[in-house]
Amino acid sequence: SSLKLSDSDKGKVLVGKGALEDYIAVLSQEIYGIHHVKVIVKLEDQCIDVRINASIEPGINIPETSGEIKSNVRETIKKVTGIEVKEIELFFKQIKAKEE
């Protein structure tokens, strides 16, 4: 499934759900201490709901890091696609060091 970014007499621009999920996973992993990210996007009416499942390194401040992830995802998705991110739910499945 996909979300329409624009529609004109010259054609449509769509972005796929999978493309958004992959991009949000990359954005989430840009934040220090976050790894093993899986993203689920739910398409709404010209906006999206996001669930991010991730692991976080021990000793990382979870509330602060969660805020960074949410801000980064919201701002970047809006800037790059024009899509509003309605809700972001974060689930940390593990507090564990990243294995190299």
Predicted regions and their residues:
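Cytosol-/stroma-facing membrane-proximal "stalk/adaptor" domains immediately downstream
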Residues: 58-100
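Short edge beta-strands and adjacent turn/loop segments
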Residues: 31-57, 92-97
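Elongated extramembrane "stalk/tether" segments
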Residues: 1-37, 42-45
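Short amphipathic alpha-helical segments at helix-loop
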Residues: 5-9, 53-58
